[in-house]
C-alpha cells in the first residue's frame, strides 16, 4: 500500500505542473453563510474576485448563487488555500473541474475543508408535484481533486446531489489527515444513475466518464498498467501533492509545501547564506520570499517583506513598517524602542471591538496612520445605555481629520444626518486593504444619507472591492476615477441603489469647471481630484498671484505658494522665488543680509547661541553691527539703538569681592564643623559597636576545603654545614651540605639552595612559594622539603638525591638500562603525578630533568618552581606570563596560558618519550616559536625505536589537542603497571638479556662518596621516619623471623676504577610500623635479596607457599600485598610472591666482534667521546644506544672556572639554576664571587615566556 500510494495513475500526464508561468493569485472571502450586502451585485462580486484566478489565497465561498448564474469564470481555479464552501445556491453544476488541492489553512466551523450545504430549489416540493425539474446542485464534478491536506468534508441538505457517497474520501485525504471528520447526507429526492463503466470500483464525481475519481492513495494492482507496474519511477516525489506527471519534484501537479519556480521544495531558499570561507553572511542571489505556498522573488503589492524571508500583512514584534521610494513595503527592526502606533479594529486591544464608539474614538486623536480597520455601525451613533456608552457625536469625528492611511478597510453603514459628506477623512490618502470586510471590501458605504463622498485626498485603494450601495442621496460616485485608485485587476466598483447621473444632474450637482477631466469627489473647487490649471492650498484656481493680487505667490509646478511676508510686492517682475525670507526680490523694511526683516536685531540671541547680537540700520536700510556688543545689563542705548559704553563703579567690585570672601569663610567654617561632628559620630558609633558586638564582623563563608596541616620546619644556620658547591645560577648557589639537628648526634645529607645577596623581593617570594608547595607533599615519589633557614638570604633545604637527575642517568647508562627499568620509572612518575593531582597541584614543568634518582630503582619528582596549588573551586590555572618549557607543555598552555592536570599529562608523555629515547631532545633543531604551529598541524614526536605500538599509543593519547581526551594519571598508573609485569613485551631493547650486570652507579654518585664528610650519614627520610641508612646502612639487629629481609650496601672499587654497589643479605629486618615506607622510601621496584651485581644464591631464597595465588605477583612494580599512598604494611603472615620481575639481574654479555660494551668513563678521562649520530628533525634518533652528543644539553650550563688539569667531565650535565642538578667538582673551579657565566634559566632556549606571542 505504501508503494502504491503515489504510483500508477498517480502520474497524471495531462495536467499542468505547478510551475506554469503566469500563475494568477486572488484573495478569497470570509463571509461564511451571511447574506451578501448587495444581492443585486453579488454575482458581479464573485466574478470580479475569481475571474482568471488559479490560486485562491483565502477561502473559496460560493453562496446564494441563482440558478441562471454563469460560473465559467471558476474553471481556472486549481488550488484553494483555505476551505471551499458551496451553500444556498441553485446552480446545477459548479465548474471546478481543474481544482486539484484544498489545503485547509482555514476551516469551516474549524473542522471542514469542503462544505456543501443546502443547495436546493426553494420550491423543491412544489416543482416535484407539478413535474418541473427542480433546481439545485446535482453533481460536484471535482474530477481533479485528489488532495485535502487538512480538514474534513461536510455535505448536507442537497436533495438533488448525486455521487457524493461514491467518492473514496480516504484516498482524497492526506496521510496525516485520515482522522478528519466526514459527514455526508445521502438523502436525495431523485434516483441517481451509476458511475460510468470506465470508473473502477464505482468511484466517481459525476455521471460522465471524465468524472471518474482519480485514485492516488489506494490503487488496486489490476488498475496499474502492466508495462509500469510498481516501478520505483512510477512514484511521485515526497514533496508532491495531488499527483504528478513524473518521479521528480518538478513533475508535481501541486506542491505539498512550497512551489519554487515549478519545483516543489520543503523550504524556500533563504535570503542570506553563510560563507564558510570568509565567515560572514552573504546575500543569496537565489533567495526567495515565502508567499502562501509559493516562493516569490518579491512580495506582492500591499504585502510586507520581512528579514526572515516571508510576505506578511502585519510586522512582527519590535519591527516597524517602512515604505521605500519605489513603493515597496517591508518590516524593519526598530533601532531602539518602536514608536507608538495607532491600532484600529481587529488589532491588539481592539481585536474584539465591532465598531468605533465614543468609548474608543479618543485613541485615534492625532493619528496619521491606523494599523487596522474602521467601522461605523448604527450602534456607534445610537450608543449603549446598558454599557454606559454614549452616542457618537459629529464633533468627536473631527479626530480623523489628521488621518492619512488605513492598513485595513473603511466600512460605514451609519453616519450623522448633519454631515453631508465624509469630509472628516479629507486628508485620508491610502486605504491599503490588507484586511478586507467580509474578505472582499476595502471601502464599503451603504445606507447613508450623505450627498457626496468628500474624500478629496484619497489616492490609493491597495486591495479589495469598493461597495457603494443604497445611498439614496449620494452623487458624484461616477465622477471619481476609481481605476486610478485600484492596484490589481481584481478590484472593481460595485454600486447599486444610488441616484443615477441624470438624477444628480437635475440637482445641479456637477464638478467644478477647473477640475481636470471632470473628476471630483463633490461640488466646489476643493473637491477636485486634479486641477486643470493651478492648485492654491486645496482650491483649484485659474492662475497664481505672481504679478497682481495679495499675497504675492510663486509657481512650483502646478501649485501656487505664497511669498514670505517680508517680501516687497513687485509689479513688473516676480516678488519672490521661494517661500523663505532670503528668497525675496526686494525688502519693504530692512535687510539683514541675506534675509528681509521687519527690524534689525537688537539684543536678539540667534539659534544655539547665548550671545546677543546688536545691529542698527544704515541709510540704505542694511543692518550693520554695533561697535559695542553688550552681553548683559544693556539698558543705556544711543540714538541708533546700539548699547552705550558703560563704566563700572569701583564700589560694585569692592562690594562683590567682600561678599565673596565672607561667603567663602562662612562656607568653610560650616563645612569644618560638619566634618568634625561627622568624625565624632563615627568614632562614637564605632566604640559602641565594638563594646556591644557579640558576633563576628565578617560573615562565615565556609568553602568545605580540608585544612592544610603540613608542618614547615625552620632551621637555624648553625645546624647547617655547607660542604661544597653543586651549582650556581642567576638565583644564587646550590650547596651539598649536612644538617646536624641541635641536641642530636645525627648527620643528614641535604641540598641547600641559597639566594644570592641583593636578591629581588620577587625571587624571595618565589622561593617561599616553592617551599609552601613542597612542604605539603608527602608521597614517596615526590621530593620532600626538610625546612627553610630564614637568614639574610633565604635558604631552602631539601633531600640530597645521590644519583642526580633522571635525564643524566638514562644518558649515562643508556647501554645498560633494561625495559623493566624504564617502565618502572614510568610507573613511579605516573604515581607521583597522580598524587599531585589528588592534592590539586599543577606541576607545569614535568620533564626528565626534573625527576631525581634516589636509587636506580626509585625516582622522585622535583622542581616545583612553576607549580601552582588550585583552590577547592578551581579546575585550572591561568598564567599571567613568565617562562615555560615550550617543547614539554600542552598546546592550550602555549596559546591560552591554561594549565590543568591534563596539561601535565601532555608533559608526562614527553617525559616518557625522553626515557624511551635515552635522553634525546624533543623537537631537536626546531625553534621554540615554531612549536605551536607544528602542533596545530598535527605533528607529534616520532615513535622511539625501542617502543612497541602499545607504549607509543599511550604517548599519542597524552598529546591529544582536546585535553578531555587525554588519559588521567590514575589510568596511566594502571597501564604502565600492567606493562611493567611483562616489560620485554612492550619495550624491545636489543641484547637486553646480554647487558652488563655491573651496578648502575653514576659519576655523580661517585663524586658524592669521594668526600670524607659523607660517611656515617643518615637519610633524611630515615631520620623523619627511622629506617635503614643512606649510603652505608648497617644490618638491623634483632630481626624477627616474619620481617622483611633487607639489604646492606657495600662500596668496592672495580679494576677499572669504577664504583660498584653490591647488595648482600643482611638477615631479617625488624618489623616496621604501618606508616613506615618500604625500601627506597616507597620504591615501586622489588629489591628482594638480589642486589645489583650480586649473584643469586640458594641461601637467598626463602621458603614460600607454592599455591597458585602466591606464585605470581599481581603487580611486579609493587610485590608487597598492600599499598597505601606509597607505603606498605608489614607482611608478618603473608608469603611473598614467588615470581616477580628482577630488573637488576642480568647475565654478563659475551664478547662481540667489536669488543665488549664500553665502560663508564672515569672521572679523570680527557679523551673526547666518539662522535655519534645526532638526533634528527623532531627528535628522531637513528641509533638509540648512542647519545654522545646529547649530553651537551643547552638546558644545563656549568659555572665558569676550574683548571685544565681537572676539566669538567663530559658525562655530567649539571643543571643551571636548579637545586637538583649538580656540578662534578665546582669547588676546584675558582670563580669570583657573585659572578656567573652562561645563560641563566630564564634564558634557557627550552623555556619561552608566555607574555611573548608565539
Swiss-Prot record:
Alphabetized InterPro entries for the sequence: Furin-like_Cys-rich_dom, Furin_repeat, GF_recep_IV, Growth_fac_rcpt_cys_sf, Kinase-like_dom_sf, Prot_kinase_dom, Protein_kinase_ATP_BS, Rcpt_L-dom
Localization of this protein: Cell membrane; Cell projection, Ruffle membrane; Early endosome; Cytoplasm, Perinuclear region
Catalytic activity of the protein: L-tyrosyl-[protein] + ATP = O-phospho-L-tyrosyl-[protein] + ADP + H(+)
Phosphotyrosine found at: 877, 1112, 1139, 1196, 1247
Positions with biased composition (Pro residues): 1146-1161
Assigned EC number: 2.7.10.1
GO biological process, one term: positive regulation of protein targeting to membrane
Binding site for ATP: 726-734, 753
Physiological role: Protein tyrosine kinase that is part of several cell surface receptor complexes, but that apparently needs a coreceptor for ligand binding. Essential component of a neuregulin-receptor complex, although neuregulins do not interact with it alone. GP30 is a potential ligand for this receptor. Regulates outgrowth and stabilization of peripheral microtubules (MTs). Upon ERBB2 activation, the MEMO1-RHOA-DIAPH1 signaling pathway elicits the phosphorylation and thus the inhibition of GSK3B at cell membrane. In the nucleus is involved in transcriptional regulation. Associates with the 5'-TCAAATTC-3' sequence in the PTGS2/COX-2 promoter and activates its transcription. Implicated in transcriptional activation of CDKN1A; the function involves STAT3 and SRC. Involved in the transcription of rRNA genes by RNA Pol I and enhances protein synthesis and cell growth.
Residue span(s) of domain Protein kinase: 720-987
Name of the protein described by the UniProt record: Receptor tyrosine-protein kinase erbB-2
Glycosylated position list: 68, 125, 187, 259, 530, 571, 629
Extracellular side stretches: 23-652
Region (Required for interaction with KPNB1 and EEA1): 676-689
Family to which this protein belongs: Belongs to the protein kinase superfamily. Tyr protein kinase family. EGF receptor subfamily.
Segments of skewed composition (Polar residues): 1232-1242
Cytoplasmic compartment residues: 676-1254
Position of the signal peptide: 1-22
